[in-house]
């Protein structure tokens, strides 16, 4: 939010605070203008400007909707999307980490159309349901092998799935006669959704500010970002030991009898793409198990091949009690989320609901037949095309190609990732303790340069996040690396200018 507000001020004071070269760059570049200034975009043929549109846009500042034309995406094709002027962009974030099979997979479209023509909707309440929802549950339970799962529950996406996780844990502990075992421990910089409870679980302050969050039953422990938070001379293994000890100390302080669950992403996504340090999950799981605390694996971003394994739990030997799925579950062609629960959890919930007469939780769109049909087809494709194996094969080209820029760049502090997910963090002097002034908007400038050259990235402050479609070709990876390099060079020059200006 600081960066957005700073960019707004920067936009209003361009001529005063920037060298003429920067002003020329901004005034001559429609992509930069969209991000950095309040000047309207130039007239485009065959398109109607949408500045001041009627939608309350998610994760967008009010001034952006009021003052700027949005980038309107009109078409997708493979690893690319096209805006309403016909300009082509390599979609390096796969939408929002989710269009795993690219933008025009005909089998997914056919699955949706066939189901729409057969049964466009029916619910799953009161022991009524549809074949696609039953079939998808069966496939998912067979597919997830990190721990034996017994039941699946469907939602519309990841946020309401994580809300449901909280209710399940509470229901489970009430059934066991442990009504005080209700607190949740999540991690700083985690992301688990933006609804009331999932935003509380998330460890990102902007999701809490002015929403009266987080909820009081949610606690946050250390972010496992080794580069940023390790002590001098501390190895990754020692760092993991310290974080596991801090987690145990928090549990003891609060009282183990009050902690119901611990939730974690295998690789943290929106918080900056943060893979776990060595031995982290081994040590954290031991602590959680010691105090009879359920482990929830939030696989919304990592599942279905993103890390080069079918699930993130497979890569890091995580054996969860509950799992959250969404995004690539349908390659985002239809909204759907899912929860998988272990036999122990499922047995307790089934027994308790039988005593009460009903399990009083669900949504209109739980197990929506069209969403389930598309998800089933997506899972078939992941298996038939060996998508996790393909990701493992092309990942070195992606990871090594982007990371190669880090050693020679004075503004890259760290480039980190695994499989087809990667984050870059811009800092001064390559130090985690020397961020650039927020008003410089270094990350936003890099994003604008990428967009100018035909690639969309996710900007998170001075962090750049990438997770391209899992079907990205080697040639497209090379294009991604090339555009990244061009944007980086321009950003380095811009930082040099801003530093010179700052010294005056």
From Swiss-Prot:
Pfam families: Aminotran_3 (PF00202). Its EC number is 2.6.1.96. The keyword Transit peptide applies. Belongs to the class-III pyridoxal-phosphate-dependent aminotransferase family. It is an enzyme of class 2 (transferase). GO terms for molecular function: 4-aminobutyrate:pyruvate transaminase activity; cobalt ion binding; pyridoxal phosphate binding; zinc ion binding. The modification N6-(pyridoxal phosphate)lysine is found at residue 327. Transaminase that degrades gamma-amino butyric acid (GABA) and uses pyruvate or glyoxylate as amino-group acceptor, but not 2-oxoglutarate. The pyruvate-dependent activity is reversible while the glyoxylate-dependent activity is irreversible. Cannot use beta-alanine, ornithine, acetylornithine, serine, glycine, asparagine, glutamine, glutamate, valine, leucine, isoleucine, methionine, phenylalanine, histidine, lysine, arginine, aspartate, threonine, tyrosine, tryptophan, proline, or cysteine as amino donors. Optimum pH is 9.0 in the forward reaction. Gene3D superfamilies: Aspartate Aminotransferase, domain 1, Type I PLP-dependent aspartate aminotransferase-like (Major domain). It is found in: Mitochondrion. This is Gamma-aminobutyrate transaminase POP2, mitochondrial. Substrate binds at residues 191, 327, 362, 458. InterPro entries: Aminotrans_3, Aminotrans_3_PPA_site, PyrdxlP-dep_Trfase, PyrdxlP-dep_Trfase_major, PyrdxlP-dep_Trfase_small. Inhibited by gamma-vinyl-gamma-aminobutyrate (vigabatrin), beta-alanine and ornithine. It catalyses: 4-aminobutanoate + pyruvate = succinate semialdehyde + L-alanine; 4-aminobutanoate + glyoxylate = succinate semialdehyde + glycine. Its main location: mitochondrion. Induction: Not induced by hypoxia. Up-regulated by salt stress. It comes from the Eukaryota.
